[in-house]
Amino acid sequence: NSMGVKIIFISDGDVLGVISVADPKSNIDIYLGTGGGPEGVLAAAALSCLNSQMQTRLVFQDDDEKNRAKKLGIKGLNIKYNMNDMVKGDVIFCATGVTDGNLVKGIKDVRDYFEAETFVLHKSSNTNKIIKNKIKK
């Protein structure tokens, strides 16, 4: 606190946490954490669409996880990955809220339909929007 630094600990939602860093209105400067590999790729996809950067390393809890990565064809088990190592080319990222969150609202039951919000990013078209959908029951 003496340095004017605010630290927020999150236990879940690492993809949203990473996306928040790219939002100039969030007042968040950096995200540090340990999460799953699939979540890291999703975060990289979103950040790629937002013209942001990230670096990561694989962290294994045990030899089983390391062996699984090898079976998936991952060769660089101990290297630093940049975003371009994780996602390439044109990227689309979509996230639909199931429950209410900071980014989108959760699914609502409204009379004869369900209402859902989806956050959509598309790199090549520079799309960044929230789409509201109505789905008939």
Go through the PLM ranges and name each one.
Residues N1-Y113, E117-H122:
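An extended, acidic
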Residues K123-S125, N133-I135:
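Non-transmembrane, aqueous-exposed alpha-helical and coiled segments at domain scale
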